């Protein structure tokens, strides 16, 4: 945003993210999958287990929704991207009583998606499923989404191959052009310029005693 305000133009950007799995020179990132988290709450009617007709168990709708979301085949992947994937990361009913039907059931899921989707297209798809199942179960719901980044791809060009050749010349390894992994800071700069990512080996990133090889530096 700062560069946009200054109307600065960048021809190409090389981002120094830790792109290499085991050895320096293995991988150059030419894009990244998008990431979106959904926080879902199903609201039912609390009651006694012995009198289910007087209650509405939100966990019933929640389980049905999560199963359908997990069973969706969002796509088959593409030439540059692996298939999009949804994972349920939290389920919480927060009910301390064994014989009480809860009022609220919560879950969190995360989607890593390729460039066949946008966060908005995925929201529309998921919301239809959630709405349909909640209507069938006569339950209410709340859904909040957080988008960490959209999927993007820098199509290989002469600069890509130049960098690939330089890396091979120095490391004696021809780097693979890849879009695997999580989001990165390249998602910010790609809005104003084509970019690639190449950096150190990421085996210990975010771990205790994080370290890199001096020779790699």
What are these regions (language model features)?
Residues 19-23, 30-31, 36-217:
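Metal-dependent amide/peptide-bond hydrolase catalytic core
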Residues 1-31:
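Acidic/histidine-rich catalytic neighborhood of metal-dependent amide-processing enzymes
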């Amino acid at each position: 945003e700062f560069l946009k305000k200054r109307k600065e133009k960048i021809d190409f950007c090389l981002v120094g993210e830790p792109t290499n799995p085991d050895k320096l020179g293995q991988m150059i990132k030419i894009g990244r999958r998008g990431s979106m988290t959904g926080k879902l709450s199903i609201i039912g009617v609390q009651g006694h287990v012995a009198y289910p007709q007087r209650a509405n168990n939100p966990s019933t709708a929640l389980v049905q929704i999560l199963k359908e979301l997990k069973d969706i085949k969002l796509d088959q992947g593409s030439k540059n991207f692996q298939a999009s994937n949804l994972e349920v990361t939290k389920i919480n009913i927060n009910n301390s009583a064994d014989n009480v039907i809860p009022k609220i059931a919560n879950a969190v899921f995360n989607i890593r998606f390729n460039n066949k989707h946008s966060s908005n297209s995925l929201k529309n798809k998921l919301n239809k499923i959630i709405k349909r199942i909640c209507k069938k179960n006569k339950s209410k719901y709340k859904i909040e989404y957080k988008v960490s980044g959209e999927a993007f791809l820098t199509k290989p060009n002469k600069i890509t191959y130049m960098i690939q050749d330089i890396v091979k010349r120095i490391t004696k390894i021809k780097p693979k052009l890849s879009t695997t992994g999580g989001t990165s800071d390249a998602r910010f700069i790609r809005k104003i310029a084509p970019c690639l990512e190449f950096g150190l080996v990421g085996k210990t990133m975010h771990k205790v005693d994080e370290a890199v090889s001096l020779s790699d530096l």
